Amino acid sequence: MAQLDTLDVVVLAVLLAGSIAYFTKGTFWAVAKDPYASSGPAMNGVAKAGKSRNIIEKMDETGKNCVIFYGSQTGTAEDYASRLAKEGSQRFGLKTMVADIEEYDYENLDQFPEDKVAFFVLATYGEGEPTDNAVEFYQFITGDDVSFEGGGSAEDKPLSSLKYVAFGLGNNTYEHYNAMVRQVDAALTKLGAQRIGSAGEGDDGAGTMEEDFLAWKEPMWAALSEAMNLQEREASYEPVFCVTEDESLTPEDNSVYLGEPTKGHLEGQPNGPYSAHNPYIAPIVESRELFTVKDRNCLHMEISIAGTNLTYQTGDHIAIWPTNAGAEVDRFLNVFGLEEKRHSVINIKGIDVTAKVPIPTPTTYDAAVRYYMEVCAPVSRQFVSTLAAFAPDEETKTEIVRLGSDKDYFHEKITNQCFNIAQALQSITSKPFSNVPFSLLIEGLNKIQPRYYSISSSSLVQKDKISITAVVESTRLPGATHIVKGVTTNYLLALKQKQNGDPSPDPHGQTYAINGPRNKYDGIHVPVHVRHSNFKLPSDPSRPIIMIGPGTGVAPFRGFIQERAALAARGEKVGPTVLFFGCRKRDEDFLYKDEWKVFQDQLGDSLKIITAFSRESEKKVYVQHRLKEHAELVSDLLKQKATFYVCGDAANMAREVNLVLGQIIAAQRGLPAEKGEEMVKHMRSSGSYQEDVWS
């Protein structure tokens, strides 16, 4: 029983500190505003109606009766918000506007008019956390001391005039599934707001996000129509953007965006701060393959941030801004009949005063597709159905209508193949969809998003260089007729090939515009920014750590061990450092095999590396099996206040590790299984169990 008391004390002692760290996440590094979100004449072609952070004033000025707030990390929630706004306007006559939730104040929500409605489309990021742009709203609305302009307390139901709709985007492989929408919904209800319809939840972990969204919104619209006395009408396409070809400009004009991410980059004067909306064009100073087996490649790259204001801490993430593969750009332009005018200059303007143009303008069709639009993503059923009206013939139209209305048929023909929009349409007909307005494509496809990778170096050891470790994705799905190629990792492989002497890089049949717009990436450069993380080493290096990192999940732990080796070289006391690493075979994909030997020499007995090779015997062995085999070691380190880290696959490995750890605690302490699970939950909430996982 004394052992249990010790662990309880450990858990409780760090609970407060961990909670503070959790709830202040993101407030110490502000997210820069998107330079394309503000629309002066060069962006939307119209002046914005004021710069007020007062959403009620904004709605009054622009004649809106429906605002759709979004909290988005990767762009999906923003896309859903835009789709809801468009559908609400076209089907029900709502005067809608889409709003980034961080761009408005919340203290006056108690003044929200009863004849208007607010939507909250909120993604949950990581382990139940708000997205970067929703941190302040989350802290405000769920705070114990929340107060509004009209005064009063929560007991006074200050939001009684607020009608709202809620949809959350989550992943069931994480413990705190859809925590953001659930907690915000509970807070709004507690404050007296009236939810219309049920709070929807989409599950990316189950692969049903899109269908969850579609299934939720129809009964939601019915409930909203009744609550606001809306009349449904036949929807027809009404463009959000006006796209015009500008014959007075050519791609050679220095005012035309050819892939530059910001105006500063266009003008050749990029300046910091570098952020999610303003990348640094960083030189790649080293690139190599850690292994190459059949169609599997794993890259190690060193990216220089010397001479910039970019900084990172061990455990942070680096974002790579990708470029679409040339073959997919060509496919897209051909499918939509744009090949012959790919280099024509276009201007894009928002028809509505509140509409944000997602890509810079003026630009060209080619640049828009290559650098700004997510043309390689799996296509949604709803978007495919919108193209029926523009089908090249009746037979094609009939097929698209069927795909749009029959989710099982769509799943069989499109989802199972992991088709992007151009591939999906090519599977239906060889005829081009020349009548599809380019504005519809801008509206229906997300803006291309940066991809995040765990940094695999220590900022203490190399503050001016960031290491990344990435497996190049090239996968043939069961039943699929083509190989699905990762956009960013194949781009990185092409850069590696070019840097290492290949004059015509062609990774897995993909070609890329490696030199970038106007050759601004020449010399092997890539656009990047840094995202800070709470996945951190203990401040006291003598504290033990246990790391679980199979495959490229070992990336941050290379940085952790690199840092501890440097601290030991300085004469600091370094505690037990245990790594559980797994891969297929020791002579095939054992990442950083030689480096571990060097670190072992530097750290001596304090470093212990335990391996699991899944394909060296008939019975597959994974890291969770090794964890169980070393239960006594794990239990002893936990008693010494060890921090437990997991990095890698969320759907299988991370879940299994979580389960096994609970079993270890229970078995080693003679406790019921439920108590072991409870202790793991306490470790999570206190910050002594940390995850950097993906699905």
Swiss-Prot record:
UniProt region (Disordered), positions on chain? 497-516
The GO terms describing molecular function are: flavin adenine dinucleotide binding; FMN binding; NADP binding; NADPH-hemoprotein reductase activity
Q: Which reaction does it catalyse?
A: 2 oxidized [cytochrome P450] + NADPH = 2 reduced [cytochrome P450] + NADP(+) + H(+)
The main place the protein resides is: endoplasmic reticulum
InterPro entries attached to this UniProt entry: CysJ-like_FAD-binding, FAD-bd_FR_type, Flavdoxin-like, Flavodoxin/NO_synth, Flavoprot_Pyr_Nucl_cyt_Rdtase, Flavoprotein-like_sf, FNR_nucleotide-bd, NADPH_Cyt_P450_Rdtase_alpha
Cite the ranges annotated as topological domain Cytoplasmic.
Answer: 32-695
The residues covered by the Flavodoxin-like domain are 66-221
Q: What does this protein do?
A: This enzyme is required for electron transfer from NADP to cytochrome P450 in microsomes. It can also provide electron transfer to heme oxygenase and cytochrome B5. Involved in ergosterol biosynthesis.
Instruction: Report the sequence similarity comment from the record.
Output: Belongs to the NADPH--cytochrome P450 reductase family. In the N-terminal section; belongs to the flavodoxin family.
Q: In its UniProt entry, what is this protein called? A: NADPH--cytochrome P450 reductase
Instruction: Output the lineage of the source organism.
Output: Eukaryota, Fungi, Dikarya, Ascomycota, Pezizomycotina
Name the gene. Answer: cprA
